[in-house]
Amino acid sequence: MAEHSTLGQNVPKSPAPPEGLFLMDGIEGLRSLPQHSVDMLLTDPPYGTTRNFWDVPLPLPELWEAVRWAVKPEGAVLFFAQCPYDKVLGASNLPMLRYEWVWYKSRCTGFLNARRAPLKRTENILVFYQKLPYYDPQFEQGKPYKKTADRGGNSPNYGKFVRSGGGSEDGLRFPGNLLTFPSVQRTVHPTQKPVELCEYFIKTYTRPGEVVADICAGSGTT
């Protein structure tokens, strides 16, 4: 990971934040909120892999303390991440780590290292929570199909199970964890994420009117 220094860069002065944003330390921002007032945390933290002055990883013990304070126990906590930072972040809270989404980008990154390593075409989104959160799967459209008849079985991984049958005329499929969204073409921040991707996650884990927090605003996509 990159050293925690500006490497000679001048730190620009931050402009006045627009209404709805708060210019402050993100962890302190979570701590300042009422306890368990956030339904979902969706943020793109610094990975610590570049020379940018702002690319300094958050202190993880303090981060998780603030997360447990502000986010409801049944709230989803989603962090964008990429190797090697995703490994560090996931291992920092294994009791809350549940699974990951993978964003398949339309544009690769890492061209300066193309002769030493494969181009980076994906980024991970790690999902943490204490208790099972609200989950509204965003179904994908496919060809109509017929479900299998009711039957049971015994899996070495999961034990006994019963598979319910029935028919389907609409062809809707449950989503897999690989999501394809186009990269942002004209960015205002070097690591800007697509609005559509963030919207997908917000629809998946929250109901209308619930509170979503982002402690690393960047371009303000969330």
Briefly describe each language-model feature range.
Residues 2-222:
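Core catalytic lobe of class I
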